[in-house]
Amino acid sequence: MRSYDFSPLWRSTIGFDRLFDLAESAQRATEDNYPPYNIERLGDDRYQISLAVAGFSPDEISVTAEQNVVTIEGNKTDKTEREFMYRGISTRAFKRQFNLADYVQVKNASFDNGLLKIELVREIPEAMKPRRIAINGATSDNLHKLESRAA
């Protein structure tokens, strides 16, 4: 019996509470997995993306939020010629995109000890939140009063 791991289909989406286009996500899952990242749920409407970008400085990384997509790009500019006997720290250029659900916004980005952390918050407008509607009509007390008057 075969088992399929669908976790790559879910890991680049944040705040979605519904299924999305699996074909598009499957294509994204086959792409390069650099840099490694985590997506954490910090609360009901709070999320955090952490990317391991060791070897990059904050001015070599750009974070762009446009519509429902967060794009993180890194370009290492090594101006000095150095001779490495072994190079294990990757400094290649990268571009990583994350699709966000409606009303999820980037609140903050911070860089500390080689980790880029991007804080996200889902803020649903008041007009879009569910609300309870009062039903107007005859209550059972009013109905009994009307019946006793009729009798």
Curated annotation (Swiss-Prot):
Residues 28-138 form the sHSP domain. Pfam families: HSP20. Transmembrane segments: none annotated. One of its GO terms (cellular component) is cytoplasm. Keywords: Stress response. It comes from the Bacteria. Belongs to the small heat shock protein (HSP20) family. This is Small heat shock protein HspD. It comes from Bradyrhizobium diazoefficiens (strain JCM 10833 / BCRC 13528 / IAM 13628 / NBRC 14792 / USDA 110).
